[in-house]
């Protein structure tokens, strides 16, 4: 998680967003680089689509035989009509804003693919103007 924080130092400064991490000491038996990609994509979006002086919270912990990854932001939120489509390849909620923020439109599709491949689940909670919380549950392979 420290590596991801360092990776986004410039982006955090550019958007004037603060990153808070709470990572429990857990052992995940699975593909670590996939998990790093998943977290990185979620954190990147949470920073880019946040409000100025916003916050991103990352909490990683274990519950029963699962690893839980929760990324929550104080950003712009996602309209209800778009929430069912944000994990589709190339889908963008606001195409004009997305051009300004950059990216390929693949980040959340990659997240969904990694989660599905690892037989996990994704839960989205978002309110327009209040932010978004994405919770990933991944079974700990043994």
Regions found by a protein language model. Give the residues of each.
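Short conserved segment of the HATPase_c
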Residues: 78-92, 112
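Short helix-loop "hinge" at the ATP-lid/N-box region of the Bergerat-fold HATPase_c
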Residues: 46-47
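Short beta-strand/loop element within the Bergerat-fold HATPase_c
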Residues: 53-65
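Conserved glycine-rich
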Residues: 119-120
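Acidic ATP/Mg2+-coordinating residue in the GHKL
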Residues: 73
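Short conserved segments within the C-terminal catalytic ATPase subdomain
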Residues: 11-20, 25
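Conserved micro-motifs of the catalytic ATP-binding
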Residues: 23, 27-33
């Amino acid at each position: 998680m420290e590596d991801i924080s360092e990776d986004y130092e410039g982006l955090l400064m550019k958007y004037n967003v603060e990153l808070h991490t709470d990572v429990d000491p857990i052992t995940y038996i699975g593909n670590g680089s996939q998990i790093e990609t998943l977290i990185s994509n979620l954190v990147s979006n949470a920073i880019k689509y946040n409000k100025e002086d916003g916050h991103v919270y990352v909490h990683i912990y274990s519950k029963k035989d699962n690893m839980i990854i929760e990324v929550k932001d104080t950003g712009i939120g996602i309209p209800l009509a778009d929430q069912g489509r944000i994990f589709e390849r190339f889908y963008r909620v606001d195409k004009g804003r997305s051009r300004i923020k950059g990216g390929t439109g693949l980040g959340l599709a990659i997240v969904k693919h990694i989660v599905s491949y690892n037989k996990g689940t994704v839960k989205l909670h978002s309110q327009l103007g209040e932010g978004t919380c994405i919770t990933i549950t991944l079974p700990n392979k043994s």
